[in-house]
Amino acid sequence: MMQVLLVTICLAVFPYQGSSIILESGNVNDYEIVYPQKVTALPIEAILQPEQKYEDAMQYEFEVNGEPVVLHLEKNKNLFTKDYSETHYSPDGREITTKPLIEDHCYYHGRIQNDAHSTASISACNGLKGHFKLQGETYLIEPLKIPDSEAHAVYKYENIEKEDEALKMCGVKHTNWESDEPIKEASQLFATSEQHRFRERYIEFFIVVDQRMYNKHNNDSAAIRTWIFEMLNTVNEIYLPWNIHVPLVGLEFWTQGDLINVVSSADKTLDSFGEWRRRDLLNRKAHDNAHLITAMHFDAQTLGLAYTGSMCHPKYSTGVFQDSSEINIFVAITLAHELGHNLGISHDVPSCTCQTKACIMSPYLSDQPTKLFSNCSEIQYERFLTQRNPKCMINKPLRTDIISPPVCGNGLLEREEECDCGSPENCRDPCCDAASCKLHSWVECESGECCDQCRFKRAGTLCRPARDDCDMAESCSGHSADCPIDGFHANGQPCSHNLGYCYNGKCPLTLYQCRAFLGKDVVGVQESCFQYNRLGNTYAYCRKENGRKIPCAPKDEKCGRLYCSYKSFGDYISCLPCYRANEEDKGMVDEGTKCGEGKVCSNGYCVDLNVAY
């Protein structure tokens, strides 16, 4: 029997309900005062390390709404890279870079016991501060500033008074950059989201704090640092389902003035920041992605802006976002959203769903915090991985954790261990020998679509059915835990009852494109509307040549601007163009769309299938 030391800090638990209080998140209308009890059961070897202040795993007990809850916490070991650095500037403009020791940090992810859908992102630096999801509702917790007291406030997000109810939105900037490795051709295969989600990836992340942000927080770099660490801990929690880690490689404070022109136009600020990163920052510090956080209020209620599908690019792997709220989780969601654009994910349309009212990639900030990506986001991320092959995300940064001897049986996978499922009495992993923390000799696999009870599934077992006419079903090979990469039918094969032709695994139809652009109120597409594309005016054209809008020839008119029949509030519009002044290249008919029998759109022309493919 493993020797275990039980450490318990017993504190009185008196839940107290108050009517109103001013907390870090703002004025809170309804809250509870609780006194968490820390109960930690760890092997003696794991806790007797004098250099380690914060345990790898902890438990706290307290009450919410009069019911006891147990909060399980585990340290986020991928929050920092080994070479993490901070930069600020002296009054005479000199760059000063330090490498602070952050080997024993206090930022955790967690869950509530007996709630399978619970999540938590918590700082345990000075009491418990952060948020957790319990029975589908988001709660915030923070210590009260009472001397010699362990009192904490627990409150629902909905009980925070909101000062600004204006609709906030995200911008998105599309790129046409060519990656260092060419984008895979359309005939190549897509890999599955399952394969990619469960392969670990790392975005070595750099944050720049502009002078407005620095001044807004009273030039207190320590307070800003803590705020950013808490925010990034939540961003990491959001991306965990896709097995993406976002370790912080560096933090820079523009203490003496901005190094670019930060203006109210998010578009201009992003362009300047991307150019500065390419020209300056990358020459000083290796990283995969950088974002600027600013206290500037961007035009048009924009909270942030990022390039789409640009991860790993020297200029375009960037974003800018606003310090827009006292509520840390909301700024974290904004950053996670902008980072999603860098990963090739566009805004959700009405048909996209997740388990909450709004999803991460909604174009507008929801009045309820959400940490879930939609089904659409998952598909787009999957395609980005295959088409762009972002190699910078594959390398694993060195961890900053104190290297201590592995302790078999503590439930944490450490160096020299193949598995760790806890004590033999508690182990529920059939693949793991709990006594040695090694896999059983007969184990072929641990997880995967083609793995069952630690062995490969039989060859021919269906692991992914065909999604539609353009997709193909895949079966297990019998010698791998992974479902084979997702193949699709050749471009040009008829699909959707001959209404279209397959293109890159999809069946592009103008009706679906209209609904993606305008929403569920689209009622159809009237072919006669496409004759407007012969005009060659502001929005009606087939393509651009040297910035000039080229009118469509009659044979090409179905390959220019998209027109939709739309009905809303009783009004019917038959030829509504899909056009946005600030993104005029969006709303064109998609490549591969059928424009006649045996013909598809290609670069603004209607061409024969054998020419297109």
From Swiss-Prot:
EC number per UniProt: 3.4.24.-
Residue ranges constituting the Peptidase M12B domain according to the UniProt record: 201-397
Gene3D superfamilies hit by this protein: Collagenase (Catalytic Domain), Disintegrin domain
Glycosylation sites recorded in the entry for this protein: N219, N375
Residues bound to Ca(2+) 1: E204, D288, C392, N395
Co-factor(s): Zn(2+)
First and last residue of the signal peptide: 1-20
GO molecular function per UniProt: metal ion binding; metalloendopeptidase activity; peptidase activator activity; toxin activity
Positions where Pyrrolidone carboxylic acid occurs in the chain: Q195
Broad EC category: hydrolase
Keyword vocabulary terms for this entry: Blood coagulation cascade activating toxin, Calcium, Cell adhesion impairing toxin, Disulfide bond, Glycoprotein, Hemorrhagic toxin, Hemostasis impairing toxin, Hydrolase, Metal-binding, Metalloprotease, Platelet aggregation inhibiting toxin, Protease, Prothrombin activator, Pyrrolidone carboxylic acid, Secreted, Signal, Toxin, Zinc, Zymogen
Record-level GO BP terms: proteolysis
UniProt remark on cofactor binding: Binds 1 zinc ion per subunit.
Covalent S-S links between cysteines: C312-C392, C352-C376, C354-C359, C408-C437, C419-C432, C421-C427, C431-C454, C445-C451, C450-C476, C463-C483, C470-C502, C495-C507, C514-C564, C529-C575, C542-C552, C559-C601, C595-C606
Residue positions binding Zn(2+): H337, H341, H347
Motif (D/ECD-tripeptide): 469-471
Tissue and organ distribution: Expressed by the venom gland.
Domain of life: Eukaryota
Propeptide stretches in the record: 21-194
Entry GO CC: extracellular region; plasma membrane
Subcellular localization: Secreted
Residue stretches making up the Disintegrin domain: 405-491
Subunit and partners: Monomer.
Biological role: Snake venom zinc metalloprotease that possesses high hemorrhagic activity. It inhibits collagen-induced platelet aggregation and activates prothrombin (F2).
Family the entry assigns: Belongs to the venom metalloproteinase (M12B) family. P-III subfamily. P-IIIa sub-subfamily.
Protein name in the entry: Zinc metalloproteinase-disintegrin-like EoVMP2
